[in-house]
Amino acid sequence: MSIELIIGPMFSGKTTELMRKINRYILSNQKCVIITHNIDNRFINKNIINHDGNILNKEYLYIKTNNLINEINIVDNYDIIGIDECQFFEENDLEQFCDKMANNKKKVIVAGLNCDFNRNIFNSISKLIPKVEKIKKLQAICQFCYKDASFTIKKHNKNQIIEIGGQDLYVPVCRLCYNNSY
């Protein structure tokens, strides 16, 4: 059917937007599944939770995995597939899984970071983009000047590209404040 990509910096509402879309499909009696990477620690008792603490606890299948291709047989009976924190999946895994599901008449909604704190795109997302029908880029609010923020800076431990954290570790910033921070 199709692939939709929701991207943006930390705290831009990517998971909230994914939750909103999944909820709409649940209300229309579509069978939904939400997948996140094993590294993601924001899921509580099989419920998806965003950084604001809002929980989607409707009827859906929830899967935590580090390999999407291994889940193909499980999700085959579902109409809508939501994938959160897509940047954590391996590039070929994400691209092949999403492409296969869309080709099998599934609606795939993928959410993830637009780039890391060095403003480098994640390989999994760059490989997926050519296969996507729709891209929605969200913005956060710059924590320094309160303008629209398209980037994320890391407060400390800048040698480690992938590190799970929230406001304790990451801050959304605009271009000017990003350049002033590094």
From Swiss-Prot:
ATP binds at G8, P9, M10, F11, S12, G13, K14, T15. It holds the Pfam family TK. It comes from the Viruses. InterPro entries: P-loop_NTPase, Thymidine_kinase, Thymidine_kinase_CS. The gene is TK. Its EC number is 2.7.1.21. Keywords: ATP-binding, DNA synthesis, Kinase, Metal-binding, Nucleotide-binding, Transferase, Zinc. SUPFAM superfamilies: Glucocorticoid receptor-like (DNA-binding domain) (SSF57716), P-loop containing nucleoside triphosphate hydrolases (SSF52540). This is Thymidine kinase. Substrate binds at F117, I161, I162, E163, I164, G165. Gene3D superfamilies: 3.30.60.20, P-loop containing nucleotide triphosphate hydrolases. GO terms for molecular function: ATP binding; metal ion binding; thymidine kinase activity. Belongs to the thymidine kinase family. Coiled coil: none annotated. The active site is at E85. Zn(2+) binds at C142, C145, C174, C177. It catalyses: thymidine + ATP = dTMP + ADP + H(+).
